[in-house]
């Protein structure tokens, strides 16, 4: 594939992702908090700091991996970096493979660090990247963490995608040993299982981003790029973000769990945190805001989002994320069926 074709693919991904909408029914709607009528705290007492093993985030919300690798996506990353800088959000760039192959593409990613020199930024590579290239991806952004995206369904639907996965786990283990920043194993919209969490812990991984189905759908994106569009039957593949968080319940003492995938509202963020996430990523909402409304509008959107999150935590009598995890909630029958069939031990406040 030529550099031009790779740039074109990056742009196609963004265009199709922006045109997608969230699933009409979300598993977030299957989780309900138990309301407490008289809170004992005030909104200004709520502390949204997210504390992980290696770094603290001012807010438990981050701009998740999206793009880079073309002139247009360079402009998007620059805008998002301004938003991150002005609001204090952490930010992840998309896969840096384009820059690792072609140094001319490096600035479409490094612009994020140039624009936001003091912020928390995650770099991003695939699970098959050579170890030395993973180190290079961290250096490219002076990144605080490295996301390794695992995207087998996307690759298999992608016409020119990878068909070899047998070395992925061993390669992840080698990267974890080599890089000097935390490694976040990140799904891309298909969710994670308790079996995967155990496998990752066994090779030294301490961070995951569960990225469940319900948001950007890469099966749909890649199927649109197929000449006969014949793999749309896989559009519902995988676990939702809520199911993936439930699957992580037994491993949350060993893993820093981040949540993403179909997160629509501050209430979805608060539910994710209550279910064990330390931070919550969003992609398409930020992308649409910054491209359709501009930087100032996106900053206002983030500020409003943060205030709404604090309001919900006040209703739940939670001064911080640790107290939020003690909130009481109930699941509907479909989630209860998942919990029972999967043998999950879930704390519900």
Curated annotation (Swiss-Prot):
Which co-factor is required?
FMN; NADPH; Mg(2+)
Query: Which positions are annotated as binding substrate?
Result: 9-10, 95-97, 154
KW Repeat (keyword) present: no
Q: Name one GO biological process term.
A: isoprenoid biosynthetic process
InterPro entries recorded: Aldolase_TIM, FMN-dep_DH, IPdP_isomerase
Top-rank EC class of the record's enzyme: isomerase
The Gene Ontology CC terms held by the record are:
cytoplasm
Q: Which reaction does it catalyse?
A: isopentenyl diphosphate = dimethylallyl diphosphate
Q: What is its EC number?
A: 5.3.3.2
Keyword Hydrolase listed? The answer is: no
Q: Report the locations given in the UniProt record.
A: Cytoplasm
The UniProt annotation places Mg(2+) binding at: 155
**Which Pfam families does the entry link to?**
FMN_dh (PF01070)
The entry's keywords: Cytoplasm, Flavoprotein, FMN, Isomerase, Isoprene biosynthesis, Magnesium, Metal-binding, NADP
Q: What is its main location?
A: cytoplasm
Q: Which Gene3D superfamilies is this protein grouped with?
A: Aldolase class I (3.20.20.70)
Q: Which GO terms describe its molecular function?
A: FMN binding; isopentenyl-diphosphate delta-isomerase activity; magnesium ion binding; NADPH binding; oxidoreductase activity
Which sites bind FMN? 65-67, 95, 124, 186, 211, 216, 262-264, 283-284
Annotated signal sequence range: none
Q: Which PANTHER family match?
A: ISOPENTENYL-DIPHOSPHATE DELTA-ISOMERASE
Q: Give the protein's function.
A: Involved in the biosynthesis of isoprenoids. Catalyzes the 1,3-allylic rearrangement of the homoallylic substrate isopentenyl (IPP) to its allylic isomer, dimethylallyl diphosphate (DMAPP).
The Swiss-Prot or TrEMBL record describes its family as follows: Belongs to the IPP isomerase type 2 family.
User: What do we know about how this protein assembles, alone or with others?
Assistant: Homooctamer. Dimer of tetramers.
Q: What is the name of the protein in this document?
A: Isopentenyl-diphosphate delta-isomerase
> What gene does the UniProt entry assign to this protein?
fni
């Amino acid at each position: 594939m030529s550099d031009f074709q790779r740039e074109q693919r990056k742009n196609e991904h963004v265009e199709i992702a922006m045109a997608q909408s969230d699933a009409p029914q979300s598993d977030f709607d299957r989780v309900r908090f138990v309301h407490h009528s008289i809170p004992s705290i005030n909104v200004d007492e709520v502390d949204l700091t997210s504390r992980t093993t290696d770094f603290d985030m001012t807010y438990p919300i981050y701009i998740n991996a999206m793009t880079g690798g073309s002139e247009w996506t360079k402009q998007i990353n620059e805008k998002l970096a301004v938003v991150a800088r002005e609001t204090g959000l952490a930010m992840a760039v998309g896969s840096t493979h384009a820059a690792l192959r072609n140094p001319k593409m490096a600035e479409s990613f490094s612009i994020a660090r140039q624009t936001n020199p003091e912020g928390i930024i995650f770099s991003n590579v695939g699970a098959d990247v050579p170890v030395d290239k993973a180190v290079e991806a961290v250096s490219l952004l002076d990144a605080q963490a490295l996301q390794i995206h695992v995207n087998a369904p996307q690759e298999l639907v992608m016409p020119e995608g990878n068909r070899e996965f047998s070395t992925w786990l061993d390669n992840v283990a080698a990267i974890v040993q080599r890089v000097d920043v935390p490694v976040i194993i990140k799904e891309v919209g298909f969710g994670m299982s308790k079996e995967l969490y155990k496998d990752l812990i066994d090779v030294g991984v301490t961070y995951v981003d569960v990225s469940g189905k319900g948001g950007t759908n890469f099966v749909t994106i890649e199927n649109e790029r197929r000449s006969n569009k014949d793999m749309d039957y896989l559009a519902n593949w995988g676990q939702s973000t809520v199911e993936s968080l439930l699957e992580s319940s037994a491993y949350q003492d060993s893993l820093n769990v981040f949540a993403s995938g179909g997160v629509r509202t501050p209430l979805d963020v608060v539910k994710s945190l209550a279910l064990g996430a330390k931070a919550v990523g969003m992609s398409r909402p930020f992308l649409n805001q910054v491209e359709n409304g501009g930087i100032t509008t996106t900053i206002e959107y983030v500020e409003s989002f943060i205030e709404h999150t604090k309001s919900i935590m006040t209703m739940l009598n939670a001064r911080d994320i640790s107290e939020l995890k003690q909130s009481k909630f109930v699941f509907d029958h479909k989630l209860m069926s998942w919990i029972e069939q999967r043998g999950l031990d879930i704390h519900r406040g």
